[in-house]
Amino acid sequence: MGDMGDPPKKKRLISLCVGCGNQIHDQYILRVSPDLEWHAACLKCAECNQYLDESCTCFVRDGKTYCKRDYIRLYGIKCAKCSIGFSKNDFVMRARSKVYHIECFRCVACSRQLIPGDEFALREDGLFCRADHDVVERASLGAGDPLSPLHPARPLQMAAEPISARQPALRPHVHKQPEKTTRVRTVLNEKQLHTLRTCYAANPRPDALMKEQLVEMTGLSPRVIRVWFQNKRCKDKKRSIMMKQLQQQQPNDKTNIQGMTGTPMVAASPERHDGGLQANPVEVQSYQPPWKVLSDFALQSDIDQPAFQQLVNFSEGGPGSNSTGSEVASMSSQLPDTPNSMVASPIEA
């Protein structure tokens, strides 16, 4: 009965090593996401037998562990031409599900490097530029080997801009009906877009002559140019309709944020701040105390000034006065320079 009051003991979890299948009694357990546990001596690369710990990256595939180098070598994406892998800083060219280095993206017939905007065809034996693709197609038709209706002529594609090797590839669209060809999406480069936008700004509806000039300037097909102008006009029309709707809703549009209602405002241009004070301006003048004027007057060295001469004459001509100008000068030199030197003396009764 006494044992019933004891707290229940927690069940100890048992860790089993995925590598050897034995129980792990070590102090440290290496756990690989999500729930795989290993002995420190059992977690190693299946190819090079390098020990894997928390300081390196571990990859698991089909129950086997690999280091980063061997995993990329075995299962990483490789160039369809040279069969060499890509680094994280490489830019690649994609053609359907195949990936190429920029230097390897060449025609197999003439070895000309395909740049963004060039049309090419992807066949079983590699990439072909448009000229060599037409030669191969004419040769196959001239040899009396007509194409099967289930395998129509391969459509030409247009090379897009190079992208980073780390960017995931887009899944190609799969048609259920085999007799339909896949529509190729045309990707324009910056020079082609600049030419089309400049022409559109001058005339949104170019005539046939202008379209022919655009074909020569951009190297695009007439169909691509026609579709681009149609899409551009449609986008601008939708944008103008949306702007009109926003302008109509703006007078009645109010924003309510956490119970506070406000009217949207548009920031204007900055302007100079006038202050807007109601008080009148006050003119501030410098104030000079009287003792400073007297002290400056006494320290003047030029005795020929009229004010000083007048003071001397007054002292000489005054009744009962025997003082001279030198005495006046000596008395004036005894005047204090600053008010701090003035000390009040008691008055004798």
From Swiss-Prot:
One of its GO terms (cellular component) is cytoplasm. GO terms for molecular function: bHLH transcription factor binding; chromatin binding; core promoter sequence-specific DNA binding; DNA binding; DNA-binding transcription activator activity, RNA polymerase II-specific; LIM domain binding; metal ion binding; nuclear estrogen receptor binding. Residues 17-70, 79-133 form the LIM zinc-binding domain. Residues 312-349 are annotated as: Disordered. GO terms for biological process: atrial septum morphogenesis; axon regeneration; canonical Wnt signaling pathway; cardiac cell fate determination; cardiac muscle cell myoblast differentiation; cardiac right ventricle morphogenesis; cell population proliferation; cellular response to glucocorticoid stimulus. It comes from the Eukaryota. Residues 262-291 are annotated as: LIM-binding domain (LID). Residues 181-240 bind DNA. Ubiquitinated probably by WWP1 E3 ubiquitin ligase; ubiquitination is followed by protein degradation. Disruption phenotype: Embryonic mutants exhibit growth retardation at approximately 9.5 dpc and die at approximately 10.5 dpc. Between 9.0 dpc and 9.5 dpc hearts are severely abnormal, appear misshapen and unlooped. Hearts are completely missing the outflow tract, right ventricle, and much of the atria. Conditional mutants for retina expression show a decrease in several gene expression levels involved in the differentiation of retinal ganglion cells (RGC). SMART domains: HOX (SM00389), LIM (SM00132). Keywords: Activator, Developmental protein, Differentiation, DNA-binding, Homeobox, LIM domain, Metal-binding, Nucleus, Phosphoprotein, Repeat, Transcription, Transcription regulation, Ubl conjugation, Zinc. Induction: Down-regulated by beta-catenin/CTNNB1 in mesenchymal stem cells (at protein level). The down-regulation probably proceeds through ubiquitination by WWP1 E3 ubiquitin ligase and protein degradation. Residues 321-343 have a biased composition (Polar residues). DNA-binding transcriptional activator. Recognizes and binds to the consensus octamer binding site 5'-ATAATTAA-3' in promoter of target genes. Plays a fundamental role in the gene regulatory network essential for retinal ganglion cell (RGC) differentiation. Cooperates with the transcription factor POU4F2 to achieve maximal levels of expression of RGC target genes and RGC fate specification in the developing retina. Involved in the specification of motor neurons in cooperation with LHX3 and LDB1. Binds to insulin gene enhancer sequences. Essential for heart development. At neuronal promoters, displaces LDB1 from LHX3 LIM domain to form a ternary complex in which ISL1 contacts both LHX3 and LDB1; allosteric structural changes in the DNA binding domain of LHX3, induced by the ISL1:LHX3 interaction, may explain differences in sequence specificity of the different complexes. Interacts with LHX3. Interacts (via C-terminus) with POU4F2 (via C-terminus) isoform 1. Interacts with POU3F2. Interacts with POU4F3. Interacts (via N-terminal domain) with MLIP; the interaction represses ISL1 transactivator activity. Interacts with GCN5/KAT2A. This is Insulin gene enhancer protein ISL-1. It comes from Mus musculus. The gene is Isl1.
